[in-house]
């Protein structure tokens, strides 16, 4: 069932870590909604900054937020003014002390979420969906991806009947748990309705972080 399940969720605790790292008892529901609010607020405010993911860690009444972005300059601003304003707004939103860190994504062409958002943005600008998919696949493969698969679903090119079209190159082993597969989803709001964009990027195998026993029993 590797094709049906979310590729990141399937690999949690094996080669991937959670985006929200905290434990709560009775307050779990409240904190979960707070996480969703934080992510939605950052995504809306920094839409042009290429935000791939937002990681959240909690300790007592403090929140550590790590923003993974392709354009850290936009997030930080001149002299750090933008990031400081964002931190204060997050503190007002949550009522807690917020520590904000910015992490740069060196190769945005290999980040599935950013690729999906880029293809969706091109579809909104009326660029042909096949061309947008082909360009994204080509860029990812040139930068070292071992495989990539893109799916666009909806009223493609204004067709009366919705359909899904795929474009792929290389291999994407969805069943292999040690396979480092990144997954992203975005929606394009066109005049004909929404078009969903899904992206899978395979970057190679990740071996577990433990002492590997060689043949013959020696470590």
From Swiss-Prot:
Keywords: Ribonucleoprotein, Ribosomal protein, RNA-binding, rRNA-binding. It comes from the Bacteria. Residues 38-106 form the KH type-2 domain. One of its GO terms (cellular component) is cytosolic small ribosomal subunit. The keyword Coiled coil does not apply. It holds the Pfam family KH_2. PROSITE patterns: KH_TYPE_2 (PS50823), RIBOSOMAL_S3 (PS00548). GO terms for molecular function: mRNA binding; rRNA binding; structural constituent of ribosome. One of its GO terms (biological process) is translation. InterPro entries: KH_dom, KH_dom-like_a/b, KH_dom_type_2, KH_sf_prok-type, Ribosomal_S3_C_sf, Ribosomal_uS3_bac-typ, Ribosomal_uS3_C, Ribosomal_uS3_CS. The keyword Nucleus does not apply. Part of the 30S ribosomal subunit. Forms a tight complex with proteins S10 and S14. HAMAP family: Ribosomal_uS3_B. Belongs to the universal ribosomal protein uS3 family. Binds the lower part of the 30S subunit head. Binds mRNA in the 70S ribosome, positioning it for translation. This is Small ribosomal subunit protein uS3. It comes from Moorella thermoacetica (strain ATCC 39073 / JCM 9320).
């Amino acid at each position: 069932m590797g094709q049906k399940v979310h590729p990141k969720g399937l690999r949690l605790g094996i080669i991937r870590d959670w985006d929200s790292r905290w434990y709560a008892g009775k307050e779990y529901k409240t904190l979960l909604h707070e996480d969703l609010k934080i992510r939605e607020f950052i995504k809306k405010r920094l839409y042009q900054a290429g935000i791939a993911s937002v990681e959240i860690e909690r300790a007592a009444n403090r929140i550590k937020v790590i923003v993974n972005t392709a354009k850290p300059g936009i997030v930080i601003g001149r002299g750090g003014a933008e990031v400081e304003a964002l931190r204060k707004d997050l503190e007002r939103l949550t009522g807690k002390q917020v520590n904000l860190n910015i992490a740069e994504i060196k190769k945005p062409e290999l980040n599935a979420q950013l690729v999906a958002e880029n293809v969706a943005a091109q579809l909104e600008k009326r660029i042909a969906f096949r061309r947008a998919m082909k360009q994204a696949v080509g860029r990812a493969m040139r930068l070292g991806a071992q495989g990539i698969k893109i799916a666009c679903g909806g009223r493609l090119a204004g067709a009366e009947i919705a359909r899904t079209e795929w474009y792929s190159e290389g291999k994407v082993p969805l069943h292999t748990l040690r396979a480092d597969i990144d997954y992203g989803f975005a929606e394009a709001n066109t005049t004909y309705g929404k078009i969903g964009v899904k992206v899978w990027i395979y970057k190679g195998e990740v071996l577990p972080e433990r002492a590997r026993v060689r043949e013959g029993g020696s470590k």
